[in-house]
Amino acid sequence: MTSMMAMGEPRLNWDVSPKNGLKTFFSRENYKDQSMAPSLKELCILSSRRIGENLNASAGSVENEPTVNSAAQAKEKVKTTVGMVLLPKPRVPYPRFSRFSQREQRNYVDLLVKYAKVPPNSKTVGINKNDYLQYLEMKKHVNEEVTEFLKFLQNSAKKCAQDYNMLSDDACLVTEQILKACIEQVKKYPEFYTLHEVTSLMGFFPFRIEMGFKLEKTLLALGSVKYVKTVFPSMPAKLQLSKDTIPAIETPEQIAAAMHYDISEDPNAEKLVARYHPQIALTSQSLFTLLNNHGPSYKEQWEIPVCIQVIPVAGSKPIKVIYINSPLPQKKMTMRERNQIFHEVPLKFMMSKNTSVPVSAVFMDKPEEYISEMDISYEVNECRKIETLENLDLEFDDDVTELETFGATTTKPSKSPSPASTSTVAPMTDTLTAPSIADTSEAPTSPDISAHSRSLSQILMEQLQKEKQLVTGMIDSGPEESKNKDDQRFIPCGEKVSNSDKPLVQDSDLKTSDPLQLESSMEIETSSKNDMATEMESVDERVNVLENTDTNSKEKTVTSEAANTEDVVLDSSDTDEDCLIIDMECQSNSHGKTAEVGSNLSSKPASLNSSSGQTSTGNQTNSTCPEESCVLKKPIKRVYKKFDPVGEILKMQDELLKPISRKIPELPLMNSENSKQPPISEQPSAPSDACSWPKSIWPSAFQKPKGRLPYELQDYVEDTSEYVAPQEGNFVYKLFSLQDLLLLVRCSVQRIETRPRSKKRKKIRRQFPVYVLPKVEYQACYGVEALTESELCRLWTESLLHSNSSFYVGHIDAFTSKLFLLEEITSEELKEKLSALKISSLFNILQHILRKLSSLQEGSYLLSHAAEDSSLLIYKTSDGKVTRTAYNLHKTHCGLPGVPSSLSVPWVPLDPSLLLPNHIHHGRIPCTFPPKSLGPTAQQKIGGTRMPTRSHRNSVSVETKSLPAQQVENEGVASSKRKIT
């Protein structure tokens, strides 16, 4: 019956299906969802999330959610803390604890973040001086531990030497394909070479950095360039390194063809060479190779093919052009270098956006060369010492403003007077004769003074033109002719004094030596006190006479005419004579003073010669003229206050003697040989403009060396339709000068970014070049490796090619192939890092090699440098004759490059100034040992996870023991069970 009821009626089911489960309530999925522990998926997401987000930011994002239960909040909190607390485990356990506590380490990290990149004279330092002093004091003690830690890292590298020989299968395969494609490019060069010459890498003459690599002009920019990508969804970022993805990005053949595209076969370079006639044409890669030679080891091995051609020039003699192609593959290559090649292409692809712009729109170079004041002052002083002291015997340290006049007779550039010069001096003599004969008791009237002032303006104009001819003749005549003239300079002086009744202008006056002006400054210093006293008396007499005259009418006329005279002088003088204003002013000043005190002169006729003028003014009747009396001397300046019509010119001279301003845009673009000087009326008339100094013809070191561009080529714009643009990437052709050498460099812009044009113009945004340097790290668990000399030289070379470049260094873990840090280096930071390089030595090597190539004849050559050798071998192609000593290039590069044998591990020290995100979060000083553990409460506050409560009392042995295994999670210390073989 029961069975009948069960079959007739529906069976009762008292079990309710779970709302929050599928079939079983406590399933594994529900347990994972309700558990406070993070799942494996969450841990994986946390490990790949962007490092640097602090706990406050994560907690804030959780609080903003509308409805979240307590379990989800706890899970999110655990997920955040676990992801941020994990520290990389060291390859070798730490031998000891740090001498700094956790609080001290966190303190120093905060100070390091605040003051690491702040200059000592900044406002931040001035406001918080106590903190900065504390930072400096702690830095001294930290550096001591950093030294010990680096020794520990070096020993760790020796224990883990196999790490530096590690290369994955994909990396090995991709690297082999790229190297084989590069070896195929070697076959296009001649096979046999014979040794032509052996020379030293280092030159024998020091190189001046301030006269170094300077941009003349950006000739041509072809192609497009992509934007750089610097923000990634998660860090560390995994690179796409499979053997299938890399050929899809860029095939090995394309990589090899781009690396070995010779400039000697470039049709664009051929057209530019025919127009601009540079002595040398080279690629950016060959320029870097020639600069990357660091003594005394010279460990870089390289081979560079060179092609020397003679190009005919219409209407001129043929010119010789040296083509320096890209370097050949290395004969031996380390595993680090192979790893670098393997990671370079994927990093380049990952840090590129899809958008691109024409490379011609990129703001590649600074519009002006910003030279520091110290460099400018050093350069100016050196130029003056070299040119004036040795060649012209002119001492710029002498105060030539004290000279009263140099005499009218010294203005003749040649010994024999020309008719033009005689006619010019004659009116000058007539003008000065009348006031000389006039009675001293009579005050001159206003019309006389006005007429005399008008003649004074003519005098200044004529003397200014003759001073130009004088200095030009002196520079052309040389020191020997000046010396011959010095022997005759006092003969006419004595004749004039003894024969005072002769006419004012004679042939002997015009034959006075040209260097009288130059040596008068030296004679001022050796003059006697009696002559100075006589000069003082004569000055006082002249001042008293002027006070008794009708000053109201006279001063107005003289002042107005002097102002007009000054304007005429400024308008008619070009900037090429700015340095000669010192001599011109003094001479012009003498005529101005003679015009003013003409009524005080005796009735005896006065000569235009400075010696006779001084004698007549001082009422001297000597029949002979000593050397000291042949030059006028003025010990004080108070005479020039109101009575000197050219007193304002002295102010102009003082402005010219001030240091040159910081910005000199004309300095890299000076030309003294090929450039055409503009007319005098077109030259700027402002004498205080500091930029006019480098254009002067007085110190020849200010002139542009030979081979620079003429003005017509500086303004020439190339038609891009006449040139062949690359299918991929871009080409930029630039013209640089290295002293007297002109270099055509073919380079490229790797990536670009948009940033403000300057600090003052933040609203104006332009595209600037960016260079990304991949760097493979072998001790990423301890910190970041410092830049090597070659890597610094690479960044420096890019800054030479594109002065507006910014730099990024992509630090890649060699074991995980992940980009764990993207370091940005500004131009200011790069300058600080470049102090480790001997830039003058690198320039010296480059200049020496280029000059050696300039001495070679037409043909094909091969530059060969062996590792750790200071000599350079120059091979020349064999002319059909093959000997046993011939160098077979194809046979040398027939196989893959080998691995160099070395007894030492290629360890690179870490950079203690570079903070990683885990350093900032945990308060760890870079390149120091872990601090001692605190109590459990403090540990849980700092780390956010459970920490062991047991303290460690036993001492730690440096050789055998590591830190206890309980601290592996928090401290990043390897377990003591691990054995390093």
UniProtKB/Swiss-Prot annotation:
Compositional bias ranges of the Basic and acidic residues kind: 480-489
Which segments show compositional bias classed as Low complexity? 408-424, 599-624
The name under which this protein is listed is Little elongation complex subunit 2
Q: Which GO terms describe its biological process?
A: positive regulation of transcription by RNA polymerase III; snRNA transcription by RNA polymerase II; snRNA transcription by RNA polymerase III
- Classification via PANTHER family: LITTLE ELONGATION COMPLEX SUBUNIT 2 (PTHR14633:SF3)
Q: Which residues carry this modification: Phosphoserine?
A: 17, 326, 573
Q: Which residues carry this modification: Phosphothreonine?
A: 575
- Region (Disordered) residue ranges read 406-427, 475-516, 591-627, 669-690, 930-981
Cross-referenced Pfam families, in alphabetical order?
A: NARG2_C
Q: Where is the composition biased (Polar residues)?
A: 671-686, 954-969
Cysteines engaged in disulfide bonds, as pairs: none
Query: Is Thylakoid one of the keywords UniProt gives this record?
Result: no
Which keywords fit this entry according to its UniProt record? Answer: Nucleus, Phosphoprotein, Transcription, Transcription regulation
Originating species? Bos taurus
Q: Where in the cell is it found?
A: Nucleus
The record's family statement is:
Belongs to the ICE2 family.
Q: What is the lineage of its organism?
A: Eukaryota, Metazoa, Chordata, Craniata, Vertebrata
What task does this protein carry out?
Answer: Component of the little elongation complex (LEC), a complex required to regulate small nuclear RNA (snRNA) gene transcription by RNA polymerase II and III.
What is known about its subunit structure?
Component of the little elongation complex (LEC), at least composed of ELL (ELL, ELL2 or ELL3), ZC3H8, ICE1 and ICE2. Interacts with ICE1 (via C-terminus domain). Interacts with ELL.
Q: Name one GO cellular component term.
A: euchromatin
